[in-house]
Amino acid sequence: NNKKPYFVGLAGGQGTGKTTTSSIVKIILEKYFKLKVFKISIDDFYKTRKERLNLSKKVHPMLMTRGVPGTHNAQMMLNFFKKAKSKNFKKIELPNFNKAVDDRSPKKNWYKIKEKPDVIIFEGWCVGAKAEMNKTLKKSINSLEKVNDQKLIWRKYVNQELKTKYKKLYSQLNCMIYLKAKNFSLLQKWRL
């Protein structure tokens, strides 16, 4: 099968149902359309705890906390996209991040894709996010940034990652789905 997989980006705030939606879409596409579907979260591509510790020392302490662009292994994601599109598809092994230990699972627990998927669902809160214009980065936007990022080093680093590595990655998505909550208080309620 020389046909390239169709990449679906699925984003939304925490608690909007990204994982549930991607699971349902996967079931429908497999059962009713007989397609091979693989779904993975951007969370599985977080840098290891050690890599984030080094990043937090080198760039900014807030980068120890996983979540924002720059805390994922962008090269690993790009390699995955490239391998999945390859005419000579070979088995792909992808990381599985264990949030309970805040680190990548051992390789024996990684995802294994043995056949080329028809559809790949790539989900996460920041999937498809775009960089801000530099003029919007001139001041902190919340109390966390005001206290911990007064010189905007963290904010500018995250934005630069979006502008470069993540832009290259997201440009390869064939379509984007964004799940939007009616308001922020609903997200808080759904997370409880």
Segment roles from a protein language model:
Residues 1-9, 13:
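Extreme N-terminal, non-catalytic leader segments
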Residues 20-21, 25:
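Hydrophobic positions on the alpha1 helix immediately C-terminal to the Walker A/P-loop
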Residues 17:
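Conserved glycine(s) of the Walker
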Residues 38-41, 45-102:
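Conserved nucleotide-sensing/catalytic segment adjacent to the nucleotide-binding pocket
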Residues 119, 125-192:
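Conserved NTP phosphate-binding and transfer environment spanning the P-loop NTPase/kinase superfamily
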Residues 27-28, 56-58, 137-140:
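Glycine-rich, phosphate-binding/catalytic loops in enzymes
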Residues 27-38:
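Post-Walker A helix-loop "phosphate-sensing" segment adjacent to the P-loop in P-loop NTPases
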